[in-house]
């Protein structure tokens, strides 16, 4: 047994690997401790319960999937952002099979409100980023938004389409890109 205390990030990395390999059922204090080569007590130094561990693992997976790229090109305009988001959704489904479809069900079954909160925090971060892109996109027509149709409301529509695509595991953004072009831009050009 490894006597060196592991870090929170190493614990979350081991949790992500367990999720990738065996799904949510594999994440518990004992299995993560074994994967890290540390005692169960070492995990409890960072997480006081399985719920706390799973909640942090959810946040960690969302961060891994939607971590902003270094160069920022994906956030130059709305079309680039949508393309990047759909690429990341596909990456997430490949890296973490069943994550999008099953993790909220896990929280409901086990009463894990902390995990649901982490999921909603991640969603809010995605919505905020999308809204920022909409507000700063130089290609958007001046009259595209008004009091009834705000960047925040359109970000919500785009996010709903994204969640629908996740459920269907359809990572082709072409229809959403066309909606953006027709709704926000002059003509149909990029």
Question: How should these model regions be labeled?
Answer:
Residues 4, 126, 147-155, 172-177:
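Short amphipathic alpha-helix in the helical subdomain of ABC transporter nucleotide-binding domains
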Residues 47, 103-112, 164:
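Short helix-capping/turn signature of helix-turn-helix
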Residues 4, 10, 14, 18-52, ...:
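Helix-turn-helix
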Residues 56, 70-95, 151-155, 177:
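Hydrophobic alpha-helical connector segments
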Residues 59-66:
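Short, basic, alpha-helical segments at the C-terminal edge of helix-turn-helix-like DNA-binding modules
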Residues 94-95, 111-140, 149-152, 156:
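Amphipathic alpha-helical packing segments from all-alpha helical-bundle domains
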Residues 79-105, 167-171, 189:
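Helical hydrophobic small-molecule/effector-binding pocket
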Residues 1-6, 143-145, 190:
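N-terminal intrinsically disordered/low-complexity leader segments
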């Amino acid at each position: 047994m490894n006597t060196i205390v592991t870090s929170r990030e190493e614990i979350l990395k081991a949790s992500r690997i367990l999720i990738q390999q065996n799904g949510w059922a594999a994440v518990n204090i004992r299995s993560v401790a074994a994967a890290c080569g540390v005692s169960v007590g070492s995990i409890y130094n960072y997480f006081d319960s399985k719920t706390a561990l799973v909640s942090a693992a959810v946040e960690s997976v969302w961060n891994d999937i939607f971590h902003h790229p270094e160069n920022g090109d994906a956030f130059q305009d709305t079309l680039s952002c949508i393309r990047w988001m759909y690429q990341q959704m596909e990456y997430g489904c490949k890296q973490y099979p069943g994550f999008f479809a099953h993790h909220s069900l896990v929280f409901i079954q086990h009463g894990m409100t902390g995990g649901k909160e982490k999921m909603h925090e991640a969603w809010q971060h995605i919505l905020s980023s999308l809204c920022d892109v909409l507000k700063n996109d130089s290609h958007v027509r001046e009259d595209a938004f008004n009091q009834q149709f705000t960047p925040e409301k359109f970000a919500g529509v785009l996010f709903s389409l994204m969640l629908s695509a996740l459920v269907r595991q359809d990572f082709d953004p072409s229809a959403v890109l066309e909606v953006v072009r027709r709704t926000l831009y002059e003509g149909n050009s990029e």
